[in-house]
Curated annotation (Swiss-Prot):
Catalytic site: E78, C141, H165
Localization: Cytoplasm
Reactions it catalyzes: Release of an N-terminal pyroglutamyl group from a polypeptide, the second amino acid generally not being Pro
Oligomeric and partner information: Homotetramer.
Species for this entry: Brachyspira hyodysenteriae (strain ATCC 49526 / WA1)
Top-level EC class: hydrolase
Official protein name in the record: Pyrrolidone-carboxylate peptidase
GO terms of molecular function: pyroglutamyl-peptidase activity
Role: Removes 5-oxoproline from various penultimate amino acid residues except L-proline.
Length: 201
């Protein structure tokens, strides 16, 4: 089995992005699952173009996109993506779409194709804080989650897919007093559990 796991490049003046720091630290194989890692640009449209190319070439059994949610303290298991870009800040190429539809022929929203409640149970067993989240925002994270689920539906693919938000890691909060964070090792462990739980349930 093949799992495509994506993370983002740093954005908004951050020097690192915990999503890619964790994804790039995953082993290349977990049990009998081949782990394929992909770094996405934090850029509207270019991010899904790179993702779609990889989906076509790799043909994975599961796709888990990971992004940064600074200020959250837990692993956020995103339930739904909405068909709108409404950026509060500029992306890494200066784009700032406001109230723009992502795909004109797409549904208003798509639900995660990951077993998010079961994942939460498994993470709780090993004392990793997690929660089901009902909003992935309207920046590039929601953009890529929606695009992934749109692609799966549009192409009638029988694969699992969804999005996970992760907190800042230790290196990012040295100048941010009282800001929630999680160690990179804990995020990596969480991703391993998410991958296995998603594929085996």
């Amino acid at each position: 089995m093949k799992a495509l796991i994506t993370g983002f490049e740093p954005f908004d003046k951050e020097e690192i992005n915990p999503s890619w720091e964790a994804v790039s630290s995953l082993h290349n194989n977990i049990d009998d699952i081949e782990i394929i890692k992909l770094k996405l640009p934090t850029v509207f449209k270019k991010s899904y173009e790179k993702l779609f190319d990889s989906l076509e070439n790799i043909k994975p059994d599961i796709v888990i996109c990971v992004g940064q949610a600074g200020g959250r303290y837990e692993i956020s298991l995103e339930r739904v993506a909405v068909n709108i870009d409404d950026a509060g800040i500029k992306d890494n190429e200066g784009n700032q779409p406001i109230d723009e539809i992502i795909f004109n022929d797409g549904e208003n929203a798509y639900f995660s194709r990951l077993p998010i409640k079961r994942i939460k149970e498994e993470l709780n067993k090993i004392s990793i804080p997690s929660a089901v989240s009902n909003t992935a925002g309207t920046f590039v994270c929601n953009h890529i989650m929606y695009s992934l689920l749109y692609y799966i539906k549009k192409n009638n693919l029988n694969i699992k897919g969804g999005f996970i938000h992760v907190p800042y890691i230790t290196e990012q909060i040295l100048d941010k007093p009282n800001t929630p964070y999680m160690t990179k090792d804990m995020i990596v462990k969480a991703l391993e559990v998410i991958i296995k739980t998603s594929l085996y349930n």
